[in-house]
């Protein structure tokens, strides 16, 4: 990215630079964002600010979290621009917003430049704050991001403002003092006039100006300056300085930057969760084969498939699923449903949109976006429209639709996961108790997910087609950039709710598969022992043909879904005993013996260990071995690349296996994950799942 107005002769239209920004994988880009967000110092000079850095400063309370430094090399150019304005006025120059009125009244003239700046701030202080605690104030995190982005823009030296003002705003940032800005009231063209006027109002000491300190106290401008250590009193703005602060897109682009940081992380998370979904559903991993996606050409889908392929290639679940799917293949669907099988094709375009939106916002936070632009080298004040925040509005609309589509896929996968008719042998509603009549598992959670998804789909509608003309029809088209960014922030919150809920459900499914394997192993072991003990001889003391039925009995167990007989494996009314009876009866009929006696003996010995969710002390409804980690069959998740995510939920966050016998509700556990995601704690375990990926799909092997 060429900074400070430099033109690259080989790329005069900037298309080459825009294309180059998309080189490499999306995952690598997310890793870079995360690294940038963890830098202790953000040094800005006007053209190199990154989304991750904006997110970091937004979430930090003050310099102890992230310190902001100004590049001293910017001082001369900022000073030159400021001095040019004063010199131009002294020689009778006529400049918009310096000697003229504003917007639709720019035909008016004045020679009192400082007074004009005072009136600019007064009439733009049009925001409504309510009581100050009822949701009408912009969150301080967004204000911090806006201050950072505005400073970055003004450092480029095209705006006619003193460097000392930028230093003062930086001191406010570093001491955790955030001006109070109204949540609403901007159309982001001509910039974010109304909210930015409150930043200018604070540094000029307007009596209505307020700020919030790092400990949440509200203070006036004088106290804010004292806390920040700004000496010399309030600023009296020179001509153009008020306009330089307010006439820009920095609030919309700042919020958009923080939103896009989260959107990129959640996009990668959706890829990982789709792979985990395949694991717990005993899915068929061939949907990730590189040839399929290479033939469709879309890079987002190719990468999404490669990421899922990587996780599934190292999955113990997939080895087991292969065995399961090989049993009676002609009686099973040949392919999985769309929510799994087309997940790369669904997520790929969303990732492409999110990447493009991220780069557009990154260009905007490094742009000169006020009016007029002061060209010191040519001695001109260029009157244009860089304040038009259309890149923000359009990018946010596009990103929000992509976020809604990610949520739609997540809901479709979740709905399959909790539905016993679709989840390939898992329990109804992922219930974890012995008695399914007293455990409805994730039923309420599915209702909540439907609510989240519905609201998210509504938010997917565009904002930018609702533009209203303003300022005496001077601002007859405007971007609504901040409005769209706010709605995208809402969409991100809802996707976090959905992701949290889905993660808890997937971990429940992982443990149910573990339970399933141990129950089946226990039943097989018991049937084998009982068969060898009691089926060798018939009641008359002769060798029984039933002694040859052991293999068929084990095969019948393999073919029967464990949770159909989990209440009591020895119950004659449940499917397992009916299938075992059929095996013995077939042997009896073929040999002329009576099979009922053998079945009765088998039942009398009770298939112990097959009561899968018995209330063992401390087991939370699971057999003691599974609950205590001493089960004969280990949990396959420990031998899968998705394990770091599971470990994070179960160990770091302490989320438990849910059963009707416990008081712990699904919402309590989902909330733990939601807080973890919101605090950024999920990023490391998510990336750990992919640490071995080399950025390439598996090779296409031709036999």
Curated annotation (Swiss-Prot):
UniProt lineage: Eukaryota, Viridiplantae, Streptophyta, Embryophyta, Tracheophyta
Active site: 96 (proton donor/acceptor)
Residue list for modification 2,3-didehydroalanine (Ser): 190
Protein family (similarity comment): Belongs to the PAL/histidase family.
Protein's UniProt keywords contain Amino-acid biosynthesis: no
GO CC annotation terms, alphabetical: cytoplasm
Name this polypeptide is given: Phenylalanine/tyrosine ammonia-lyase
Activity's thermal dependence: Optimum temperature is 55-60 degrees Celsius.
UniProt-annotated binding residues for (E)-cinnamate: 247, 335, 341, 371, 443, 471, 474
């Amino acid at each position: 990215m060429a900074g400070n107005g430099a033109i690259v002769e080989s790329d005069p239209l900037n298309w080459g630079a825009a294309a180059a920004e998309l080189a490499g994988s999306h995952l690598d880009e997310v890793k870079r964002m995360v690294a940038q967000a963890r830098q202790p110092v953000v040094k800005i000079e006007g053209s190199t600010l990154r989304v991750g850095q904006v997110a970091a400063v937004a979430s930090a309370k003050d310099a102890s979290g992230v310190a902001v430094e100004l590049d001293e090399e910017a001082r001369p150019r900022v000073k030159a621009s400021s001095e040019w304005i004063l010199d131009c006025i002294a020689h009778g120059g006529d400049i918009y917003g310096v000697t003229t009125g504003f917007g639709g009244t720019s035909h008016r003239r004045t020679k009192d430049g400082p007074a004009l700046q005072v009136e600019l701030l007064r009439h733009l202080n049009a925001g409504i704050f309510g009581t100050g605690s009822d949701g009408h104030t912009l969150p301080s995190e967004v204000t911090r991001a806006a201050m950072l982005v505005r400073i970055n823009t003004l450092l480029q030296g095209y705006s006619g403002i003193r460097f000392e003002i930028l230093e003062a705003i930086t001191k406010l940032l570093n001491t955790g003092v955030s001006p109070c800005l109204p949540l609403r009231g901007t159309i982001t063209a001509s910039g974010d006039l109304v909210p930015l006027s409150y930043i200018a109002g604070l540094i000029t000491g307007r009596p209505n100006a307020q700020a919030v300190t790092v400990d949440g106290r509200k203070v006036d401008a004088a106290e804010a300056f004292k806390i920040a250590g700004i000496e010399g009193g309030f600023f009296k703005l020179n001509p153009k300085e008020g306009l330089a602060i307010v006439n820009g897109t920095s609030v919309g682009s700042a919020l958009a930057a923080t939103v896009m940081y989260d959107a990129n992380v959640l996009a990668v998370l959706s890829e990982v969760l789709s792979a985990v979904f395949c694991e717990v559903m005993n899915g068929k991993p061939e949907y990730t084969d590189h040839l399929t996606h290479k033939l469709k050409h879309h890079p987002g889908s190719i990468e999404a498939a490669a990421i899922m392929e990587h996780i599934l290639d190292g999955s113990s679940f997939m080895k087991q699923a292969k065995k399961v799917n090989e049993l009676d293949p002609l009686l099973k669907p040949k392919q999985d449903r769309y929510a799994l099988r087309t997940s790369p094709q669904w997520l790929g375009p969303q990732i492409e949109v999110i990447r493009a939106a991220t780069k557009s916002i990154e260009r905007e936070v490094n742009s000169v976006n006020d009016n007029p632009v002061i060209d010191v080298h040519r001695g001109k004040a260029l009157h244009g429209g860089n304040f038009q925040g259309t890149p923000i509005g359009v990018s946010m609309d596009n990103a929000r639709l992509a976020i809604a589509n990610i949520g739609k896929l997540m809901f479709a996968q979740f709905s399959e996961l909790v539905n016993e008719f679709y989840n390939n042998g898992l329990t109804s509603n992922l219930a974890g108790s012995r008695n399914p009549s007293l455990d409805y598992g994730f039923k309420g959670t599915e209702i909540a997910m439907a609510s989240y998804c519905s609201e998210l789909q509504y938010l997917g509608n565009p904002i930018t087609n609702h533009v209203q003309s303003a300022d005496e029809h001077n601002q007859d088209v405007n971007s609504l950039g901040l409005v769209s960014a706010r709605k995208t922030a809402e969409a991100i919150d809802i996707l976090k709710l959905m992701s949290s809920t889905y993660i808890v459900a997937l971990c429940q499914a992982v443990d149910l598969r573990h339970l399933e394997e141990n129950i089946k192993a226990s039943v097989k072991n018991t049937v084998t022992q009982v068969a060898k003990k009691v089926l060798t001889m018939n009641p008359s003391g002769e060798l029984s043909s039933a002694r040859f039925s052991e293999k068929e009995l084990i095969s019948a167990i393999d073919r029967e879904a464990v949770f159909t007989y989990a209440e009591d494996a020895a119950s004659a009314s449940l499917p397992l005993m009916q299938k075992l009876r059929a095996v013995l009866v077939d042997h009896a009929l073929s040999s002329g013996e009576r099979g009922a006696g053998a079945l009765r003996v088998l039942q009398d010995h009770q298939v112990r260990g097959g009561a899968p969710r018995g209330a063992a002390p401390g087991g939370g409804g699971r057999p003691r071995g599974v609950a205590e980690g001493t089960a004969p069959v280990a949990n396959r998740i420990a031998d899968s690349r998705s394990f770091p995510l599971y470990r994070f939920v179960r160990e770091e966050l302490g989320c438990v296996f849910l059963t009707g016998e416990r008081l712990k509700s699904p919402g309590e556990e989902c909330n733990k994950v939601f807080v973890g995601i919101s605090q950024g704690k999920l990023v490391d375990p998510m990336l750990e799942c992919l640490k071995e990926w080399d950025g390439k799909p598996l090779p296409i092997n031709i036999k």
